Amino acid sequence: MPDAFTIRPAAPNDAQEVARIRVLGWRFAYQGLVPQGYLDSLNVAEDTERMHGYLSQLPQNLPPNNIASVQGPNDGEKRSFMLAVRDDAVLGFCHFSAAPNNADRPGRATPGGEMVGRLHSLYIDPDALGQGIGHALMSHALSTFTAWGCERVHLWVLEGNSRAVSFYE
């Protein structure tokens, strides 16, 4: 049985590992669903720069059990980016947010509206699949959504991605 892993908030210095897992995850999950040329064009170096910028917006030096939430650009929005780590190696990540929903404009934050969670991404290093990492990250996200007062959570799955549909069901 593989060694245990921990879940902790992401930091800017994790950007390269997050980018590596995102690229590997896309190439694994979307093979045959997305044009191969696009998958081949995914670039860890470019994604690292983007990830570093995003992760730099999150609060730093939080205790490991902190939900690492930060106010988003919209009133009442919260965001979190968590990693599964074993021996300092990043095995997967989960990025999620919540915002007060605007009933007239779904997806737009409205102060005082019902808090609705959104799972933006959950990727696991393909070599680490089947070890409970995805379930642990999802469980953490669901607990955080509850703490944020969310009664609903939205996510999108690419049509044909039966592995993801099975996981989320």
Regions found by a protein language model. Name each.
Residues M1-P2:
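Basic/polar N-terminal segments that are highly enriched at the extreme N-terminus
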Residues E151:
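Short acidic/polar active-site loop segments enriched in Thr and Asp
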Residues Y168-E169:
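Conserved active-site tyrosine of GNAT-family acetyltransferases
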Residues F5, P9-P12, A19-D127, H135-H140, ...:
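Acetyl-CoA-dependent GNAT
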Residues P12-A15, N161-S162:
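Alpha-helix N-cap/helix-start and coil->helix boundary motif
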Residues D125-D127, Q131, E159-G160:
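Active-site acidic-Proline motif in GNAT/NAT acetyltransferases
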Residues L155-V165:
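Conserved beta-strand-loop-alpha-helix junction that forms the acyl-donor binding cleft
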